Structure formats: C-alpha cells, structure tokens
From Swiss-Prot:
This is Radial spoke head 1 homolog. MORN repeats lie at residues 20-43, 44-66, 67-89, 90-112, 113-135, 159-181. The keyword NAD does not apply. The gene is RSPH1. Component of the axonemal radial spoke 1 (RS1) and 2 (RS2) complexes, at least composed of spoke head proteins RSPH1, RSPH3, RSPH9 and the cilia-specific component RSPH4A or sperm-specific component RSPH6A, spoke stalk proteins RSPH14, DNAJB13, DYDC1, ROPN1L and NME5, and the RS1 complex-specific anchor protein IQUB. Interacts with RSPH3B. Interacts with RSPH4A. Interacts with RSPH6A. The lineage of its organism: Eukaryota, Metazoa, Chordata, Craniata, Vertebrata. Residues 1-42, 222-309 are annotated as: Disordered. Expressed in trachea, lungs, airway brushings, and testes. It is linked to Ciliary dyskinesia, primary, 24: A disorder characterized by abnormalities of motile cilia. Respiratory infections leading to chronic inflammation and bronchiectasis are recurrent, due to defects in the respiratory cilia. Situs inversus is not observed in CILD24 patients. It comes from Homo sapiens.
C-alpha cells in the first residue's frame, strides 16, 4: 500500500520549463491560470503566482498518480486529495508537501484511517477500520504506530487498554456485549521457538493475556485502566463489581476456566470471541474453551437474578 506517501512521487520543478500555455506577469513569469506539460511527462493545470504553482491546481504524474488541491509556492499545502498509482488515496490537510493535520486515507484493501497526521505519518488521535473483519482501533498513534491509550472494537466485544508498537501492553479489560467485563493484563513474553530457529538471534515477543477478574459493565473513559486490586475487608464495594473480596458466582465460574496465561491478540478475530449461544440466557450455558479461546459465563440466569437483586 502507498502509506509511505508521495515522497516517492516528486513533482517536476518549474525550472524545467517544458510546454506552457497561460498567463504571465510583466516579468514573463507564469502567473494566473495556466497549463504545463513538463519534460518528465507530468502535467499541471491550475493557478500560478510569480512562476510557481500557487492556489488550486491538478498535478498528474505520468504513472497515473495525481494530486488535486491547494499549492503554496510549488508545495502541496492546505486541503488536497492525492490518488496513488495503486488506487489508494488520501483526502485531507497538507503542509510543505507532507500529509499534516487531519485527513482520511483509503487503502486498496478497503481499510481506512481517519484522524490526525504529522509529517506524513499517522500521529495523534485516529481511527483505523479493518474492512475484512469490521474491527476498528480507536485511539492514539505515534509515528505511524498504534501506541498509547486506545480501544479495539470487535463485533460483540471490545478491548480497552494501552498499546505499544501495535501490541497491547499492561492492564486492560475486555468488555462483552452480554453484560460483563474481564479484567487482566497483557505481558510481553518470548515466543516459543522450534529447533530450526534456535540459532536465530532475533527473538519474537508476543503479548499474553492474564485474566484476573470478572465484573459488571462500567463506564469507559479514555484513560489507562488501573490494575484491579483485592481487599481483605468485607463489605467494601469495588467499582463495577459486586464485592472486591470474592467475585460473584458468575465471576467465579468464569475465572475457574482460565487460571494462568492465555495467548490472546486483540487483532485476531477468532482468538477471543464471546459467542452468544442463545438469546434465552436461562436455557443455555456459556463455557470457556481453552483451545478456541472463547470466554463465556456459566449461568447467565444467575447473573440476571443477581442484577435484579
């Protein structure tokens, strides 16, 4: 994909005269509306000022790429749309020939990024939509990478926590549409390697999810979740939980199934899906499968009665 951008598609300078039709000023410089065919085969049609592209214009590269938007002294600057040779495109703000400000990038696989850009890279707050799965990352970006507090939203659940180099790290939680949250943390561990990989110096680090607690739904705020802590005193309520000492019957049933660490990647659609087996919760059970990674409740009827009480 063309996310690296138009730095690979340099526009011909106006010193290379080529063919030109249009207005000129008293000094003979290109000025006003004009059309140019440059020696390298590129073309430009639009506004000029004192011999430079300035104002609205359309620059077409001979390889099929084109830019439609604003120029300031030969530089893409302001609002503009760049269509790359592979069909991907960027619509948004430019500064000094770079994607800078707010914009939308449409990738050839139908993924989209909508948000802030800095010096040609995704940087700041932005949303990346994965077209194939419908999942989306909503949160912070640093130098083109998913990094900082964010929310990864899937079809029937979401992960809320912190990311580093596109991987979830530290404390966070999974929020399921059936009405519960699973708290825990991601720990970066070395991936197990086979014999054929023993001599390789590079070590792949993968995040592993360790679940610690199940609670009722709580309001999400875009701040790093704190690691849940237990209390020894009875009768002390923890946020979003029935009690902070011992979990309720539903939470206990869920926790019994996943003692220890699990390989769970928020970006993998089949790794951490909570399936709703039936809308009639009092007749069906939700079970946690160690192989498939499905986190389910033992008796939804019990949870519903607890909520009513």
């Amino acid at each position: 994909m063309s996310d690296l951008g138009s730095e690979e598609l340099e526009e011909e300078g106006e010193n290379d005269i080529g063919e030109y039709e249009g207005g000129r000023n008293e000094a003979g410089e290109r000025h006003g509306r004009g059309r140019a065919r440059l020696p390298n085969g590129d073309t430009y049609e639009g506004s000029y000022e004192f011999g430079k592209r300035h104002g609205q214009g359309i620059y077409k590269f001979k390889n099929g790429a084109r830019y439609i938007g604003e120029y300031v002294r030969n530089k893409k600057h302001g609002q503009g749309t760049f269509i790359y040779p592979d069909g991907s495109r960027y619509e948004g703000e430019w500064a000094n020939d770079l994607r800078h400000g707010h914009g939308v990038y449409y990738y050839i696989n139908n993924d989209t990024y909508t948000g802030e850009w800095f010096a040609h890279q995704r940087h700041g707050q932005g949303t990346y939509l994965y077209a194939e799965t419908g999942s989306k990352y909503v949160g912070t970006w640093v130098n083109g990478q998913q990094e900082g507090t964010a929310e990864l939203i899937h079809l029937n659940h979401r992960y809320q926590g912190k990311f580093l180099n596109k991987n979830p790290v530290g404390p966070g939680k999974y929020v399921f549409d059936v009405g519960c949250e699973q708290h825990g943390e991601y720990r970066l561990t070395d991936m197990e390697r086979g014999e054929e990989e023993e001599e390789e110096e590079l070590v792949t680090v993968v995040p592993k999810w360790k679940a610690t607690q199940i609670t009722e739904l709580a309001l999400w705020t875009p701040t790093l979740p704190k690691k849940p802590t237990s209390t020894d005193g009875p009768g002390q309520d923890a946020p979003g939980a029935e009690s902070a000492g011992e979990p309720g019957e539903e939470a206990q049933a869920l926790l019994e199934g996943f003692e220890g660490e699990m390989d769970m990647r928020p970006g993998d659609e089949d790794a951490d899906v909570l399936r709703e087996e039936s809308r009639e919760y009092d007749q069906e059970e939700f079970r946690y499968d160690m192989d498939e990674g499905n986190i389910n409740s033992e008796e939804e009827e019990t949870r519903q009665s607890d909520l009513q009480d």
